């Protein structure tokens, strides 16, 4: 049956043929408009990748993963990736964005977008059951969307889905839901894979997933001990099939073992064969990469990313309410030095905008130079001729963030900044990450340039900063341009809007970002089927042990 194409696909194909967009950008945008990945890949002149042969996989065994085991209550409130890497084996998402930033249907069979991008039809996969035997259906989807949009839940999804309200979600049938958007949005399918976007069982969920861990995923929870371990057990009736035609997953069990945030014991454990896989989603992996990159007993998979470490300043608190002070501190970042010493040069320099050169919308912009004398002058103009004492909060488990802070402290001194670095355990930093006036926060990879701005640099319908707006920076012109960009499909027109967005954030924004990082997935050789993902998400249903 021939796929029904969105009206914009023809124009996208024309732009691709004229060289106005890359092959990857073409595949990405056409799949967002509902074209299957196989069809989009064929249109781009490529062969669709083949799956593993049935004879190459082996069933059974236990995978041991070193990962923090945090307290888990409401999935919509997740602000760490590591608990989602455990819970995503139990509950699932409507879509899946792969390591190449291509978005596929998952619990959805497919989707269609209207020509104006304001009506999205979500067709649910049939025959899927939660692990307690309940059918997965449209009631689960409507219930979960309403959880995301409930201000009392406090989910970051509410800010990302600002184009929706409770009246926007229509149940058409047991397996179809329509979204009626207030304004156009191209990235809806990508938003549905934001890591707090796990689908919930509307019959059993009452706010605490561990108390009622019913999901559609390939595993069930056998043991969950905060700070110790999470043990997952294979379910036998999972909906998805493996290369051998039988129900996934291949493994019998997965054990996530909390080894703290010190990298040394984890490196020793994987070298000794006590651990099979290292989860770096919430801890920096540079030390392990340096120690293990030449080790013949492990696989090191690398991914370039849009992930960064953000020097963030709360604009509702002095002295950061004065843009001259913010600009002064940003000028104290010696970016080349910070990247080289904090992250071994494994990444790209940042430009104080939360849009990466890897984002398809990115508009090339000058990288600010280290200029402590200009910074000193700005401080004097702001009323601090004798300099300024500030506290900088950082999580001690991110070694590259600690080094970033130490280099900044040294290089900001000539400008008059006297920085007191306040280190604390990562868990303590996450408890207050939106509250400290000055800190360095890790921000995960997002495939499209509008996603983080929608999460972190806008206000809600009343102008109040959204849940993840840790700096409280809300700029009317920036917000209006972002809304415009969200509804613009033409890549060149979208990039022109981003030129304005980036200029505003660089000149009067609330963050510095010295670098974008590469990431690694490290596993023992017997672990097969692991794929590098720029967000460090772990999809383990089709992983096996040789």
Show which residues each predicted segment covers.
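N-terminal lobe/hinge region of extracytoplasmic solute-binding protein
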Residues: 66-115, 146, 214
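Structural transition elements
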Residues: 219, 346-381, 396-403
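Ligand-site clamp/hinge motif
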Residues: 239-288, 418-420
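Aromatic- and charge-enriched surface segment that lines or borders ligand/interaction sites
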Residues: 109-154, 172, 178, 269, ...
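Detector for C-terminal structural segments
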Residues: 29-50, 225-229, 234, 301, ...
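N-terminal secretory signal peptides
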Residues: 1-25, 50-51
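Gly/Pro-rich hinge or "lid" segments in bacterial periplasmic/extracellular proteins
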Residues: 72, 98-102, 192-255, 264, ...
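Surface-exposed binding/hinge segments that line
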Residues: 123, 157-202, 218-225
């Amino acid at each position: 049956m021939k796929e029904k194409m969105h009206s914009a696909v023809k124009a996208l194909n024309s732009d691709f043929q004229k060289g106005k967009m890359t092959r990857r950008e073409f595949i990405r945008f056409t799949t967002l408009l509902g074209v299957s990945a196989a069809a989009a890949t064929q249109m781009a002149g490529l062969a669709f990748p083949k799956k593993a042969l049935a004879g190459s996989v082996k069933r059974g065994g236990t995978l041991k993963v070193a990962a923090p085991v945090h307290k888990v209550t409401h999935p919509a409130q997740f602000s760490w990736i590591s608990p989602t890497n455990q819970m995503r084996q139990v509950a699932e998402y409507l879509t899946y964005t792969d390591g190449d930033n291509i978005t596929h249907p998952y619990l959805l069979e497919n989707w269609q977008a209207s020509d104006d991008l304001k009506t999205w039809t979500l067709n649910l996969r049939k025959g899927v059951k939660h692990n307690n035997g309940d059918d997965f259906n449209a009631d689960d989807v409507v219930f979960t969307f309403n959880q995301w949009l409930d201000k009392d839940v406090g989910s970051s999804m509410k800010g990302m889905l600002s184009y929706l309200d409770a009246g926007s979600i229509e149940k058409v049938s047991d397996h179809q839901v329509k979204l009626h958007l207030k304004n156009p949005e191209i990235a809806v399918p990508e938003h549905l894979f934001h890591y707090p976007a796990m689908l919930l069982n509307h019959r059993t969920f009452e706010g605490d997933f561990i108390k009622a861990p019913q999901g559609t995923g390939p595993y069930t929870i056998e043991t969950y001990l905060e700070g110790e371990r999470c043990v997952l057990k294979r379910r036998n009736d999972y909906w998805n099939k493996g290369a051998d035609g039988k129900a996934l997953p291949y493994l019998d069990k997965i054990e996530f073992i909390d080894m703290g945030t010190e990298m040394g014991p984890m490196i020793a454990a994987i070298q000794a064969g006590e651990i099979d896989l290292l989860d770096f989603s919430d801890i920096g992996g540079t030390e392990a990469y340096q120690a293990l990159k030449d080790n013949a007993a492990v696989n090191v998979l690398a991914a370039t990313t849009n992930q960064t470490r953000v020097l963030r300043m709360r604009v509702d608190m002095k002295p950061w309410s004065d843009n001259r002070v913010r600009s002064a501190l940003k000028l104290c970042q010696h970016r080349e030095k910070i990247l080289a010493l904090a992250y071994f040069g494994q990444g790209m320099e940042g430009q104080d905008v939360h849009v990466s050169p890897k984002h398809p919308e990115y508009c090339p912009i000058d990288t600010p130079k280290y200029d402590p004398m200009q910074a000193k002058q700005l401080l004097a103009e702001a009323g601090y001729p004798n300099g300024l004492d500030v506290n900088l909060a950082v999580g001690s488990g991110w070694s590259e963030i600690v080094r970033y802070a130490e280099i900044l402290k040294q290089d900001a001194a000539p400008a008059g900044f006297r920085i007191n670095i306040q280190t604390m355990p990562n868990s303590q930093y996450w408890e207050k990450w939106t509250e400290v006036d000055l800190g360095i926060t890790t921000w995960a990879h997002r495939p499209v340039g509008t996603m983080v701005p929608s999460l972190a640099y806008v206000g809600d319908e009343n102008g109040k900063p959204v849940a993840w707006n840790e700096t409280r920076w809300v700029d009317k012109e920036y917000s209006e341009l972002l809304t415009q960009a969200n509804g613009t499909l033409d890549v060149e027109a979208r990039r022109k809007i981003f030129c304005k967005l980036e200029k505003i954030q660089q000149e009067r924004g609330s963050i510095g970002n010295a670098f974008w990082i590469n990431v690694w997935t490290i596993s023992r050789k017997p672990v097969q089927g692991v794929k590098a993902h720029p967000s460090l998400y772990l999809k383990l249903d089709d992983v096996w042990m040789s």
